[in-house]
C-alpha cells in the first residue's frame, strides 16, 4: 500500500508557491454564515435552512456508505464538490475514500497527485483481476482521506470491459474488500453516461447530483434521473438520489434564481439547503492541489462544504 508517490511532495510545494501568499486563508466577511440567506431567515433555496449541529465523533468506522457524484454535463463543479465534501467529512472524523472514475484525472490532480506519472491506477484495478484497491491506494495529505487515482489509461477500460461477464459490477467487486475501513466512499464519475459511470451507479447507496444554476442544466438533470431509474431497476435496487447540490449560484442574476426555483419545485427536499456560490477561491485550490477547507478554511466556500457534510451525515445518520 503506497503511502505516497515519488515527486508528489515537490509538485505540491511548487504548485502552492505559484499562488501569492496573501491569497490564502482570508477571513470571512462580516455576517457570513454557513447558510447565507436572502433576509427573513430564508435561505438561497427559498426555504428556511435547517440548523444541523456538528456531528458526534465516531467510535468505530465502516461499513461505508458509497455515494456517486454524478452529472453527465461537465463543468458543474462535480470534482470540486467531491474533493471538498470529502475533506469536510474528514474534518468531522469520518474516514473517506475518493475514487477517481474520470480518465481526465481531475480529482487526482485536484489533490496534487501527478496522476500522469502513475503506473497503476483504478484502470488496472478494473481490468486486471490480480490488482486490488490496496495496490493503487494513495494516502492524501488531507486528514482521514484516501484516494484511488486515475489517468488517461482509464479511457480504454470501457472497450476492455465490454465483453466481460458482469461488467457493470466490476467496480463493486473491487471496492467490497475495503468498505469496512471507511465511513464514506465518494466516486467522482466522468461527465458521461457510459459504462464507467454505470459502474459507479451500480455499486452505490446513493447519488449526489451537482448542478449549476443554468437552464441547460435542467434538461441534463432530467436525463440523469432517468438513468438512475434504469440502473435501479436493472442493476442496483438500493440506488436512490441522495441529494441535489446547487453549484455556481449567483443570487444577483434572475437566471440563477429562476433555475433554483424550478429545481426546488421539482425535487423538493432532495435539494440540499447548502448552496455553493460562485467564488474565485475554487480555481485557486485547483492550482494549489488541496481542498478549500485547508486552503482558505474560513472562506464562504469552506463553510459551505462543511455545512454540506453536516447535511449528508444527518441524512445518512452516520
Swiss-Prot record:
Any phenotype upon disruption?
Answer: Essential for growth.
**Which superkingdom is the protein from?**
Bacteria
Report biased composition (Basic and acidic residues) as residue ranges. Answer: 21-37
Quote a single Gene Ontology cellular component term: plasma membrane
| Residues that bind ATP | 72-79
Q: Where is this region: Disordered?
A: 19-63
Induction profile = Induced by albendazole and thiabendazole, which inhibit the GTPase activity of FtsZ and probably septum formation.
InterPro entries the UniProt entry points to: AAA_dom, DNA_Partitioning_ATPase, P-loop_NTPase
Q: Which UniProt keywords apply?
A: ATP-binding, Nucleotide-binding
Mention one GO molecular function: ATP binding
Give the function comment from the record: May play a role in septum formation.
Family, similarity comment = Belongs to the ParA family.
Name recorded for this polypeptide = Uncharacterized protein Rv1708
Instruction: Give the species.
Output: Mycobacterium tuberculosis (strain ATCC 25618 / H37Rv)
Amino acid at each position: 500500500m503506497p503511502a505516497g508517490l515519488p515527486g508528489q511532495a515537490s509538485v505540491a510545494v511548487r504548485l502552492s508557491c505559484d499562488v501569492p501568499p496573501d491569497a490564502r486563508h482570508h477571513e470571512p466577511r462580516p455576517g457570513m454564515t454557513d447558510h447565507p440567506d436572502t433576509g427573513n431567515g430564508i435561505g438561497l433555496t427559498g426555504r428556511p435552512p435547517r440548523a444541523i449541529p456538528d456531528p458526534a465523533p465516531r467510535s468505530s468506522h465502516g461499513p461505508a456508505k458509497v455515494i456517486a457524484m454524478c452529472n453527465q454535463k461537465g463543468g458543474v463543479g462535480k470534482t470540486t464538490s467531491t474533493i471538498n465534501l470529502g475533506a469536510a467529512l474528514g474534518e468531522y472524523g469520518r474516514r473517506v475514500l475518493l475514487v477517481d472514475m474520470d480518465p481526465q484525472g481531475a480529482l487526482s490532480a485536484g489533490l496534487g497527485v501527478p496522476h500522469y506519472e502513475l503506473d497503476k491506477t483504478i484502470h488496472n484495478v478494473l481490468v486486471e483481476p490480480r490488482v486490488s484497491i490496496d495496490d493503487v491506494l494513495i494516502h492524501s495529505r488531507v486528514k482521514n482521506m484516501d484516494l484511488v487515482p486515475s489517468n488517461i489509461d482509464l479511457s480504454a477500460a470501457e472497450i476492455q470491459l465490454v465483453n466481460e461477464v458482469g461488467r457493470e459490477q466490476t467496480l463493486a467487486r473491487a471496492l467490497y474488500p475495503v468498505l469496512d475501513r471507511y465511513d464514506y466512499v465518494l466516486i467522482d464519475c466522468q461527465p458521461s453516461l457510459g459504462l464507467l459511470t454505470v459502474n459507479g451507479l451500480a455499486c452505490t447507496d446513493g447519488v449526489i447530483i451537482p448542478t449549476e444554476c443554468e437552464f441547460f442544466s435542467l434538461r441534463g438533470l432530467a436525463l440523469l434521473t432517468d438513468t438512475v431509474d434504469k440502473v435501479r431497476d436493472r442493476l442496483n435496487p438500493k440506488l436512490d438520489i441522495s441529494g441535489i447540490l446547487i453549484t455556481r449560484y449567483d443570487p444577483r442574476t434572475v437566471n440563477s434564481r429562476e433555475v433554483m426555483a424550478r429545481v426546488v419545485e421539482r425535487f423538493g427536499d432532495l435539494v440540499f439547503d447548502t448552496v455553493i456560490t460562485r467564488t474565485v477561491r475554487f480555481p485557486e485550490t485547483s492550482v494549489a492541489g488541496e481542498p478549500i477547507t485547508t486552503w482558505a478554511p474560513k472562506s464562504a466556500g469552506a463553510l459551505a462544504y462543511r455545512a454540506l457534510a453536516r447535511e449528508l451525515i444527518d441524512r445518512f445518520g452516520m
